[in-house]
C-alpha cells in the first residue's frame, strides 16, 4: 500500500510486479487509464501510444520535441555561424547504445580522486522530473561517495523543478547557473593557502 501511495500506481499493479516496478513499465503505466505515457528524460512530457496495453512506451515524447528543436538549431549554427560544412548527419543521441558498463567504477574513481585531492569538490545538479538519471538515485549515489561523512563539506546537491535538461525551464536555467557560479567560487582555494596534505 505504501509503495502504491508513493509512486501513484494502483496496489494491484504494484503487487503483480512484486514491489519492483521496472522504469519503462512505470512510464507506460502511470497514466495508462488516460491513454497516455510519460517521458523518460522529462516526465512532464506526455505521449500517446498506438495501444494502451504493453510493458513500455512506443517512444519517448520528450525526445520528439527535443530532436525537432535542437537538431535543426545545431545544424544551422554549425553551417551558418561557424561555416562548418559536412555530409555527416548530426545525431543528438548517437548509435552508441548499449554502452558497455562492465567495468564502470565511476563512483569509486571519483571517491578516490576526492580522497587524494582535498581541493576537489563535487556539485550534483538534478531535475526532479528526470527518470533517466533520477533525482533520488543521484542523491543516493552522492551519499555513497562519503559514507563516513569526512568529505561532506565538499559535496553539494541541488535539485530543480525540471527534467534531465534543467536549462529548458528558464527559472531553473537561471538558478542552476547561479548555483554553478557559487560552487566554483566557493571551491577555489585561497591563493595563500598551503596544500592540505
Write out the residue ranges for each language-model feature.
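Post-His helix in hydrolase/transferase enzymes
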Residues: 137, 167-182
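Catalytic histidine-centered segment of alpha/beta-hydrolase-like enzymes
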Residues: 132, 161-172
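Extended, charge-rich low-complexity interaction segments
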Residues: 180-197
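Alpha/beta-hydrolase fold catalytic core
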Residues: 1-132
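A generic secondary-structure signal
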Residues: 112, 144-145, 183
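Extended hydrophobic-aromatic, low-complexity segments
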Residues: 122, 133-135, 149-151
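Short, well-ordered amphipathic alpha-helices
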Residues: 138-146
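Catalytic histidine neighborhood in serine/cysteine hydrolases
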Residues: 147-165
Amino acid at each position: 500500500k505504501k509503495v502504491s501511495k508513493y509512486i501513484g500506481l494502483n496496489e494491484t499493479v504494484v503487487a503483480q510486479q512484486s514491489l519492483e516496478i521496472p522504469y519503462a513499465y512505470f512510464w507506460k503505466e502511470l497514466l495508462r487509464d488516460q491513454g497516455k505515457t510519460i517521458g523518460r528524460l522529462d516526465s512532464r512530457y506526455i505521449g500517446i501510444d498506438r495501444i494502451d496495453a504493453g510493458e513500455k512506451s512506443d517512444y519517448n515524447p520528450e525526445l520528439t520535441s527535443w530532436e525537432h528543436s535542437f537538431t535543426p538549431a545545431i545544424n544551422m549554427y554549425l553551417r551558418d555561424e561557424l561555416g562548418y560544412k559536412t555530409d555527416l548527419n548530426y545525431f543528438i543521441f548517437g548509435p552508441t547504445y548499449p554502452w558497455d558498463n562492465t567495468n564502470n567504477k565511476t563512483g569509486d574513481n571519483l571517491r578516490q580522486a576526492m580522497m587524494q585531492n582535498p581541493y576537489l569538490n563535487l556539485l550534483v545538479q538534478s531535475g526532479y522530473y528526470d527518470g533517466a538519471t533520477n533525482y533520488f538515485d543521484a542523491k543516493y549515489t552522492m551519499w555513497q561517495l562519503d559514507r563516513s561523512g569526512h568529505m561532506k563539506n565538499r559535496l553539494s546537491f541541488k535539485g530543480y523543478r525540471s527534467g534531465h535538461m534543467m536549462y529548458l525551464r528558464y527559472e531553473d536555467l537561471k538558478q542552476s547557473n547561479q548555483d554553478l557560479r557559487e560552487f566554483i567560487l566557493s571551491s577555489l582555494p585561497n591563493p595563500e593557502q598551503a596544500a592540505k596534505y
